[in-house]
Amino acid sequence: MVKIVQRSIGLLGGSFDPVHKGHLIISKIALKKIKLSQIYWIITKKNPFKSEVYFPLKDRIKKAKKVTRNLKKIKILYLDKIVKSSRSINIVNYLIKKKGFKNIYFIIGSDILLELHKWKSWKKLVKLTKLVVFSRKGYDKKSKK
């Protein structure tokens, strides 16, 4: 009998404005601890909860590709144009329906957990994925409430 191995995929979404060490650190930890097959950094044009954009989208994508170029298990995706949305629920639905993604781990920081209730269809997002929350200095006590 052939055993089919289910690939576990991690999604780390955001504006990556700017890309920083924290993105790499949590990606590497998630790959190791959760035994993910792949992590996709889903870069969006703009964070709807932030008023300013510091770096152009093109530069953020270029920088993300540069810092991950030697990390085969981290891939960069920009799907806003294809999905016609930067909302996480729409991107996850697209990846499930059009790309056949299954066993998705949605990776966020504890700062984002505080805002999750403001996201469009956040309950559905949590049902479709396994939520992974990483500690973020200064937010942990607040996010536990």
Regions from the language model: what does each represent?
Residues 1-145:
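Nucleotidyltransferase catalytic core that binds NTPs
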